[in-house]
């Protein structure tokens, strides 16, 4: 959970900001692990809930994206086990709907939690009390004329992409 996203969200919302986890900095990005079991165990190793901060509180968790949903769902379970009354999730990007062929290790659309689900369906799957994403238009307004690839959000790729299933390439 990038702290700059959470800190900026805190400034805009006025909701108090605090750290709810001890983070093991030696564990890298969990969503890019090749197997589901590795992704799940990595989350448990990477983050330890600070129960005194979480217990009996409503938590707003801010993250940069939801790819498969594994990390987010496990974190929500950890927070609720630690006594959080509610866990609300805010994502600082639009839903990740399409495979990225230019840098993110996501081999197929079917592995993306948002590809064929509504926000409400995702909210239920991950166990959040509410879920909100940044709108694509707001993201475009923020970056202005800098230009960037938004294919993972829109499906509009800047060039021809592989037509083959690459889902086994990372196993």
Tell me what each language-model feature is.
Residues 1-171:
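PRPP-associated nucleotide enzymes
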């Amino acid at each position: 959970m990038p702290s700059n996203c959470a800190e900026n969200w805190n400034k805009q919302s006025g909701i108090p900001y605090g750290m709810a986890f001890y983070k093991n900095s030696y564990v890298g990005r969990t969503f890019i692990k090749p197997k589901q079991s590795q992704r799940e165990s990595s989350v448990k190793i990477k983050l330890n809930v600070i129960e005194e901060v979480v217990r009996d509180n409503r938590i707003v968790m801010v993250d940069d994206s939801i790819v498969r949903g594994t990390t987010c769902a496990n974190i929500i379970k950890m927070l609720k086990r630690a006594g959080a009354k509610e866990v609300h999730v805010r994502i600082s990007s639009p839903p990740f709907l399409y495979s990225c062929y230019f840098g993110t290790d996501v081999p197929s659309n079917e592995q993306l939690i948002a590809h064929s689900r509504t926000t409400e369906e995702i909210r239920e799957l991950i166990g959040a009390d509410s879920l909100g994403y940044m709108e694509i238009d707001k993201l475009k307004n923020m970056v202005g004329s800098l230009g960037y690839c938004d294919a993972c959000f829109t499906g509009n790729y800047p060039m021809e992409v592989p037509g083959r299933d690459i889902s086994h390439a990372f196993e």
